[in-house]
Amino acid sequence: MVGCGVAVLCLWVSCGAAAGQLEYSVPEETERGVAVGNLSADLRLPAAAMSSRNFRFLSSHRELYFGVDLPSGNLVVREPADREQLCRAKAACVLTYDLVLEDPLELHKIRIHVLDTNDNSPLFPAGDVQLHIPEFLTPGARFTLPNAQDDDEGSNGILSYSLSPSQHFRLDMGSRVDGSEYPELVLEKALDREQRATHLLVLTARDGGLPARSGDAQVTIIVVDTNDNAPVFERSVYRTKVPETAPNGTVLFRVQALDPDEGSNGEVQYSLSNSTQAELRHRFHVHPKSGEVQVAASLGPPETLLEAYIEARDEGVFGLASTAKLLVEVTDVNDHAPELDFLTLSNPVPEDAAPGTVIALFSVKDEDLDSNGRVICGMSSAGPFQLTASFDNYYSLLIDGPLDREQISEYQVLITASDSGSPPLSTRRTITVSVADVNDNTPNFPQPQQELFVAENNGPGASLGRVFAQDPDLGKNGLVSYELLDVISEGPSASSLLAVESSSGAITAKTSFDFEQLRGFHFQVEGRDGGIPPRSATVTINLFVVDRNDNYPVILFPLPRNGSVPVEIVPRSARTGHLVTKVVAEDADSGSNAWLSYHISRASDSSLFRISANIGELRTARLVLPTDAVKQRVVVVVRDHGDPPLSSSVTLGVLLSNSVPQLLPDFEDVWEPGGQLSAQNLYLVIALACISFLFLGCLLFFVCTKLHQSPGCCAQSCCRSTEDLRYGSKMVSNPCMTSATIDVTTVERLSQTYLYRASLGLGSDNNSLLLRGEYNAADLRNLATGVGLNLPISCIQIRNRKGDHANVNAMPRQPNPDWRYSASLRAGMHSSVHLEEAGILRAGPGGPDQQWPTVSSATPEPEAGEVSPPVGAGVNSNSWTFKYGPGNPKQSGPGELPDKFIIPGSPAIISIRQEPTNSQIDKSDFITFGKKEETKKKKKKKKGNKTQEKKEKGNSTTDNSDQ
């Protein structure tokens, strides 16, 4: 509460200058900091003097509700004061403080009156009120209600009470001896518990404050019952009929009377009234609680009407009672039940039977008399049936509506025949009516159109799906067979692609589907039942072929021509990002299976080129350096995004040149590393070549020196011409040599030449020839003769030696099928060659000799052996052709070696060396260098079975690229 203005009630000063008393007033709950009065002004002291005179403010209360603001000299509120808490029930609430000043000493009393505010609402200490008022009280009765309390004083206290509206009660104020008032509840209208047992009222107390406050209490009035109602029967007269033979204890009926009173006033007991004749009282028994009326003795002869009275009385202090009449008619005993006799019964009934069709005809009879012999016939069934009386005691069971076997195949018809006796007797007969099936339902497919998804590349006979039609008919009428209708699809007929199993509806494929050729089609399947006449329905099936990743990407550009590598020319001044070419490819698949990406799988210089992964543009990744090789090869792989992915590749040749050459170089050689690596290889080749020439010169000089110094050397053998030394030598001084071996060895790629080396060892006492492989006697003679060694068979020793050389066979072999003659292989090969591929040994008609394969024109001869071009070579490309047999072979001398050794399958070196067992070693190395000549490819169509090929000079090469 905020009090802004403070009234000074009284101000005086007593005891002269030594003492004084000040009084102030302030409303309760005033907020902190509000000024109550100005002490400085009231004491006639400046505000500064209060501090200088050691001003002290003393209080007897625990809490300091008020204080002095020294700068202004005001008396201010420190804590809000609650009058109800400080003074409780006191009429006046005053707080006293002492004010002490020194120099001179002064003592002042301060009295602060805390004024009441309306901050409390009226409150009923007892809470809600509950009153029990009997319903027999008359109007005017008074009932005291509790007072409300309000902690406020004066006009803020309670001034008035009020009551919620009620037609039975009003509020009045009563006075006590001391003059205080209290509220009273006055009964205005009599209460009736049976109408309303509880009344709810609200008592409100309101004070006189501004604004006014109020408090409520709920007054619950419970009406106490009194026995003011008599029991009432449901009926005033109860009538019944009882057979004369009813046994004792038979319940005739149950009576019931209701009393609206409460408790014992509403509890009812039953008994026979005193108004009942004495001779009838022993024939009936009434149960006092349930009100059942039972037979206690024989009721007498038939057709007798007995009259009795039943009394119902409550258990109140003054019990109230009421009576009801009982009329009991004794009737004849109905001891015969009706009888049913069926004359005709049709079962089963076809479901297409027309309404009015007679199912059964029967008669009824009862041997009782009068009403006991009158029979009433009824029927109970869930089916469309009707029971009709034909004539006297004859009934017909008819069809009253359509039958549907698919919904209900069997009905239970209950026929009841009851007489009119009391109680009536009846006979029940249940007839089972079966409904025979008729073909009245057409096969039904769940959907008129269905979709079928089939993955391509399925195997013939694979199951694709199943069609199913429902026919609710029975037996053959519901047995559906399926047939493929070949009337809808365009293009190939559906019957050529599919088959439908007639009994199960299973759809199988006759062929394998290809998404790229056939993406989908539609067809119809007919479902026909076995009824007479049959019914049918069709379903349209849309078959969709689902794509699989079964097609490799096809590169459209660039394409190799005649098996050569496509070449692009890039100026050496090209900047970074220069477009070299664009690889164009397509994929016959669809979706992600046809989404292609490009990347470089191999390149002569991986840092020189880059390719766009999405569009396939091959561009330079950096500037062309002077050290970059002129010829660059790039392998671009095109890969789709299927699962698993498929890919294709193309090899591109890139010529780094500022001008267009008249003749494009060959890009089919070995992969060359670019940049600094190529220059290093060039220096290495030059160094190796120099060292090789120096070594061979020294070796040749050493061999010649040894030959001249050999003691067993004749002039003829030592003075051979250079041509003789080049191809071989004849040994005459010793019939047996220490060892003779024939090795086929490859050399490093030094230049575009072949190296043939023959090494012979002399002067050994071990007369044996060492060969690798297995030979017969004829082969050994041919071998000895072929290498120019006149040795007897006894001087030849066969020894198997582990190594990479294979056995020598007499038959020629075809070239290696995996060999590709590229430009890179014209310089040499890093491989080992089988001995048997170096030459063919055969015994001619003139004696043992050796026929070496030579490069010759491929003129076909009837008895000549011919070696076809290597695998991978083109038809018109240069190839190796070998001729074997007696077709004009070039005979070699016994001491000569052929001038050229041609090895089918791979270029190689044939070396013939003899190794003595002693430390004396004589070696003669013969080195020849022959240039290979490259020729252009020539195409020539074949007519007939065989054609002749043009002769080529030198060693021929192929133009297939090694990818």
From Swiss-Prot:
Q: Name one GO biological process term.
A: homophilic cell adhesion via plasma membrane adhesion molecules
In which ranges do the PXXP repeats occur? 812-815, 845-848, 886-889, 904-907
UniProt cross-references to CDD domains, sorted A to Z:
Cadherin_repeat
* Annotated stretches, region: 4 X 4 AA repeats of P-X-X-P: 812-907
Q: Name one GO cellular component term.
A: plasma membrane
Query: Disordered: where is this region?
Result: 844-963
Extract the SUPFAM superfamilies matched here.
Cadherin-like
Q: What biological function has been recorded for the protein in this entry?
A: Potential calcium-dependent cell-adhesion protein. May be involved in the establishment and maintenance of specific neuronal connections in the brain.
Query: What is the name listed in the Swiss-Prot or TrEMBL entry for this protein?
Result: Protocadherin alpha-C1
Its taxonomic placement starts with: Eukaryota, Metazoa, Chordata, Craniata, Vertebrata
What's the gene? PCDHAC1
